[in-house]
Amino acid sequence: MEYKSPVRSNLEQTADPNHVLVNMGPSHPATHGTIQIIAALDGERVAKADIHCGYLHRGFEKESEHHTYHKIIPFTDRLNYCSALNNNFAYVEGVEKLLGIELTPRCIYLRTLLAEYNRVADHVTCVAATVMEMGAMTAFLYLMTIRDYIFEHLNQLTGARLTYSFARVGGLKNDLPDGWLERLEEILQFTEKYCGRIHGLLDRNRIFIDRTRDVGAMSPEHALNWGYTGPILRSTGAKIDIRKDNPYLAYADLDFEVPVGIKGDNYDRYYVRMREIDESISMVRQCMKKLPDGPVNIDDRRIMYPTKDKVYTKIEYLISHFKLVIDGIQVPAGEIYVSHEAPNGELGFYLISDGSGRPYKLHVRSPSFAHMGGMHTLLEGYQVADVIATFGSMNMIGGECDR
């Protein structure tokens, strides 16, 4: 018996017999991860599309049930690995709320600063990949230079370029090193300068406008019906942002605008992300000015790991460290949902504790998964060449989508 892929045969049953079925992915240089797009083509036009994800599923949620709360932090890095700090902070806030602990003022502002700084890196990566696939190599190199500077700078703070594992339940891994804020201001100025060049290269570029304006367009109602959030939803004109609507960390104390688009097309998604870079830079500077003195971690040996000098010299701290590593934090029984405005949209963690040192259940509301659910509607009716540009503007991250 001839084997037929159930994925492909499903579309074959509903597609016009005169259409040509084309596979894009799951191994394709433009898919930014393992995702499969099956397109039924009528000439150069996409008549029907079917999106299939799950090829990068690693069992994040099930694995979390067998690890202590601190040991899950590195797993969250591997969701959206372009902005791992945002994943870290959303997850640990859920644990902190179940514990009922209050962060130090310095920790709150540092988390806000780092979340926005990482947002800049995520947005420049998305725009760079999208414009590169449309042939704008100069803009791509400018944006990747910004990204590299940010990642090297975060490496000085965290010890890693991408997967930081920097958050801790009750604080952060460490405070800022000497000279880090001074270098931060230099990179912000460099980013503003090079983003200005990007606007000059692309905003009124005839080729770029033809490839993006009125391509992959949607209404606010359509976006909300499919569960879109973040820059993709705001590109339609919907002014919805968790940082404004339900402030967390220090966002209630910051002055910032929520950029929105008009048509919800590829151009508006580019525009919203570029404007959000400006707003994030402004918020980082506000956090730098308002950054209070004091400790970054709470003083509670039941939650925080003791410093190494204490572990190696005092038996009570060694015992405390041992208990946290083996048994984990004893989180009171309960359940909570925490959502943050991640670079891709609403990143939520639904956490259930049974009172032990390991979560009973941890579910992730990943924005990329919701976005892929309705992406076929943005591809159908457009050209084959538009598939790559539209897919790039959605910024699907495989680790976040498939978990």
UniProtKB/Swiss-Prot annotation:
The keyword Cell membrane applies. InterPro entries: NADH_Q_OxRdtase_suD, NDH1_su_D/H, NiFe-Hase_large. Keywords: Cell inner membrane, Cell membrane, Membrane, NAD, Quinone, Translocase, Transport, Ubiquinone. It is found in: Cell inner membrane. One of its GO terms (molecular function) is quinone binding. It catalyses: a quinone + NADH + 5 H(+)(in) = a quinol + NAD(+) + 4 H(+)(out). Its EC number is 7.1.1.-. It is an enzyme of class 7 (translocase). It is a peripheral membrane protein. GO terms for cellular component: plasma membrane. Pfam families: Complex1_49kDa (PF00346). The keyword Ribonucleoprotein does not apply. HAMAP family: NDH1_NuoD (MF_01358). NDH-1 is composed of 14 different subunits. Subunits NuoB, C, D, E, F, and G constitute the peripheral sector of the complex. NDH-1 shuttles electrons from NADH, via FMN and iron-sulfur (Fe-S) centers, to quinones in the respiratory chain. The immediate electron acceptor for the enzyme in this species is believed to be ubiquinone. Couples the redox reaction to proton translocation (for every two electrons transferred, four hydrogen ions are translocated across the cytoplasmic membrane), and thus conserves the redox energy in a proton gradient. Belongs to the complex I 49 kDa subunit family. NCBIfam families: NuoD (TIGR01962), PRK06075.1 (NF004739). This is NADH-quinone oxidoreductase subunit D. It comes from Pelobacter propionicus (strain DSM 2379 / NBRC 103807 / OttBd1). The gene is nuoD1.
